[in-house]
Amino acid sequence: MEILIAEHAGFCFGVKRAIEIAYEELNKQKDTRLYTLGEIIHNPQVVKDLEEKGVRVIEEEELEKLLKGDRLIIRSHGISKKLYEFLEQKGVEIIDVTCPFVKKVQNIVEEYYKKGYDIVIVGDKNHPEVIGVNGWCEDKAYIVNSVEEAENLPFFEKACAVSQTTLIEKHWEDILEVLKSKAKELVYFNTICNATQKRQEAADALSKKVDVMFVIGGKHSSNTQKLRKICEKNCKNTYHIERADEITFEMLKGHDIIGITAGASTPDYVIEEVIEKIKSLKGEDENE
């Protein structure tokens, strides 16, 4: 049996930074309440650990409950400008761990919106990152996530297009081709983060060589879902799992080359647990 781990699997820079800062804030032992706006990352184990240590999750519709001096961690997905201003007015201590790649998209959108450009965001309209980015152009962006949606856009005098940072490269390129015919002047920025791109490329390459492919990450994680889609094209035995205990003997039976990749919100220890589980089950297989 051979277990192969894709390069660039697991925590990305932005997520790692967010987690480190959350634990640093916990260790400060301040007399103020500590919250994260939504789950800090799409990983149930990490969220549970933080909650057990005293970090509360608060949703946007509950923010009125916050008191002056409360600490609020803005997760790596970022938030809208309006929400930022609201929190400042309330006297909340904002701990902003917005991923620098996402911050870059926000800055581009704000700059070009002020210059009078229509903004087009290529991505999932329900994803927190996209919702936050849209908030830097007064929620007036056109959001498209397919070639068909792009074809239905109006014709723009001048437009600026950006991508959700976790998009699949080909998806962005296909939609961009349509956008080029939709504006007299189109300024566009491929804002897919290079860590996402490298992770996807590595998963694509590895899934072509293996009998079974495990994609580890939260079931609601956008970047993990995209990894699963990429791997499924190359390996029919692709499984999206959150935890090692989801792996069964049947998944591995008769297969010798096992591949593993992991989403940006997956800690190293979860990857290690998956490796140990595979070794344990394959040991049983060999003993039969």
Swiss-Prot record:
Binds 1 [4Fe-4S] cluster per subunit. Isopentenyl diphosphate binds at H42, H77, H127, S221, S222, N223, S265. It comes from the Bacteria. One of its GO terms (biological process) is terpenoid biosynthetic process. Pathway: Isoprenoid biosynthesis; dimethylallyl diphosphate biosynthesis; dimethylallyl diphosphate from (2E)-4-hydroxy-3-methylbutenyl diphosphate: step 1/1; Isoprenoid biosynthesis; isopentenyl diphosphate biosynthesis via DXP pathway; isopentenyl diphosphate from 1-deoxy-D-xylulose 5-phosphate: step 6/6. Keywords: 4Fe-4S, Iron, Iron-sulfur, Isoprene biosynthesis, Metal-binding, Oxidoreductase. Its cofactor is [4Fe-4S] cluster. Signal peptide: none annotated. Belongs to the IspH family. This is 4-hydroxy-3-methylbut-2-enyl diphosphate reductase. The lineage of its organism: Bacteria, Bacillati, Bacillota, Clostridia, Thermoanaerobacterales.
